[in-house]
C-alpha cells in the first residue's frame, strides 16, 4: 500500500472532476492502487529517497514537501491508469465499461488529459526538487547524487532551451548531454574539483561566507552560460569565454578557488604569451 496516498479521501484531493462513488461501486483508490504503489516507488527512487519517504507521512498535512510529493504520486499513477480505467476483463476478453448517461471520452480528449497529467507531474517535480534540497536527510541520498552531477540541477532546464512539453523526459536527455559537456570543460579548463564544488553549492545552496561566496556564484553563472551555449549550438566550447573564466580564477584573491589553483589544470595556463627576451630574435628596446 502507498504510504503517501493511504486512502480514497487523500487521493480525491488531487484528482479533479471525479463523480462520487455510489454504494457497492469500486472506489477509485482501489482501482488504481497498483499504479499508486508503482508511482510512489518511482518517486522514491528518482527523487525522494527512502529516508525522506520514511518520515514524510508523519508531517502535517499542510506541509509543502508532503503536499507536492502526494501530488506527484497521483499524477504519475493517473498517467498510467487512465488508459485502463474503462476496460474490464471478461470471459470473452476485454470490454469497455458503458454508461447510458455519460458519453465515452474521445481519443483526442484522453490524449489531452494524459498530456495535462504529464505537465502537472512535471510542474510538481520542479517544485519538489528545491524543497528536497533543503531537507537534511536528502543531502546524502542517491537521488541527490544524480542531480549533483551537473551545474544546473533544476528541472526548468528544458525551458531555457525553448522546450515546454515532456519536461522531465527532455531534462533527462539534457542531463546526459551536460555531463559530457562538463567532462570536457573540467579536463580542458576548470577541473573536476572546482565543478564539484560549484555543483554542490548550487543544488544545496551552500555558497559559503563572504568574501568567497560572490566569486563562486559568479564563476557558476559564467560556466553555466558556456554550457547553455554548447547545448544550443551543439558545438565546441567558446574558447574566449572559457579563457575569461580561467583568468578570473587565476586572479582571484588568495584562499579563493584553491581547489583549482593547486591542480595541474591551473598550471596549463601559467607563463603563456610573448615575453621580451634579449635571447629571442624579436627583442626590442
Q: What would you call each of these model-derived segments?
A:
Residues 1-70, 84-285:
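Conserved short "hinge" loops at termini or chain/domain junctions
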Residues 73:
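Catalytic-loop motifs flanking and including active-site residues across diverse enzymes
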Amino acid at each position: 500500500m502507498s504510504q503517501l496516498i493511504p486512502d480514497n479521501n487523500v487521493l480525491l484531493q488531487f484528482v479533479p472532476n471525479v463523480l462520487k462513488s455510489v454504494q457497492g461501486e469500486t472506489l477509485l483508490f482501489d482501482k488504481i492502487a497498483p499504479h499508486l504503489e508503482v508511482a510512489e516507488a518511482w518517486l522514491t527512487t528518482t527523487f525522494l529517497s527512502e529516508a525522506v519517504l520514511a518520515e514524510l507521512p508523519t508531517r502535517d498535512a499542510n506541509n509543502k514537501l508532503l503536499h507536492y510529493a502526494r501530488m506527484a504520486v497521483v499524477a504519475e499513477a493517473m498517467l498510467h491508469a487512465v488508459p485502463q480505467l474503462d476496460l474490464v476483463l471478461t470471459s470473452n476478453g476485454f470490454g469497455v465499461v458503458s454508461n447510458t448517461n455519460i458519453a465515452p471520452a474521445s481519443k483526442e480528449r484522453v490524449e489531452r488529459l494524459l498530456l495535462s497529467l504529464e505537465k502537472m507531474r512535471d510542474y510538481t517535480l520542479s517544485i519538489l526538487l528545491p524543497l528536497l534540497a533543503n531537507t537534511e536527510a536528502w543531502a546524502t541520498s542517491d537521488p541527490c547524487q544524480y542531480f549533483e552531477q551537473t551545474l544546473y540541477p533544476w528541472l526548468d532546464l528544458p525551458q531555457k532551451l525553448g522546450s515546454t512539453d515532456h519536461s522531465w523526459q527532455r531534462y533527462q536527455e539534457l542531463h546526459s548531454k551536460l555531463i559530457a559537456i562538463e567532462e570536457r570543460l573540467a579536463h580542458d579548463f576548470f577541473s573536476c574539483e572546482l565543478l564539484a564544488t560549484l555543483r554542490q553549492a548550487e543544488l544545496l545552496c551552500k555558497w559559503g561566507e563572504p568574501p568567497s561566496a560572490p566569486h563562486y556564484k559568479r564563476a557558476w553563472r559564467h560556466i553555466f552560460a558556456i554550457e547553455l551555449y554548447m547545448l544550443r549550438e551543439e558545438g565546441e566550447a567558446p574558447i574566449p569565454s572559457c579563457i575569461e573564466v580561467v583568468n578570473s580564477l587565476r586572479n582571484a584573491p588568495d584562499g579563493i578557488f584553491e581547489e583549482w589553483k593547486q591542480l595541474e589544470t591551473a598550471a596549463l595556463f601559467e607563463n603563456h604569451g610573448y615575453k621580451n627576451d634579449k635571447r629571442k630574435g624579436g627583442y626590442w628596446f
